[in-house]
């Protein structure tokens, strides 16, 4: 029998990805599924490795190790709340949307936040969550962050929407 596909969580260190991780871990606990937390990176987004010094650019492996350590530290407090959930980590070098879509091929569901650390480039290229909804190989859950992603006054009573 094959192992169940994991819940894949995209995590970039933002408060939005923390909300997504919490929801993904809760869902994993309820469904009895494992979790894989993915953080993609580039040299410009990676934390500075311990081997960095002025005038010396460390090898890519050192950046990869720094990203993996930062991810583990970022999610450690949350994982302590879900000790019964099996969690693995993946830190590929590449664009977030592309890497999450690739990883979604072996996932039950992909969980992402509404926004991340993308900044202005994300506005120009489209958000990672939009890319995932459009192209992921599995279902995608986009998690709203309480108090931030709320849009008061935008809902209409059902009967108002049915009027001619």
Describe the predicted segments one by one.
Residues 36-38, 88-92, 141:
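General small-molecule cofactor/ligand-binding pocket signal
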Residues 128, 136-137:
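Short, structured coil segments at secondary-structure junctions
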Residues 109-131, 149-153:
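Glycine-rich, Arg-bearing micro-motifs that act as flexible, cationic patches
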Residues 2-55, 135, 145, 160-164:
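Small/aliphatic-rich secondary-structure junction motif
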Residues 20, 47-50, 99-102, 123, ...:
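Short, well-ordered secondary-structure micro-motifs
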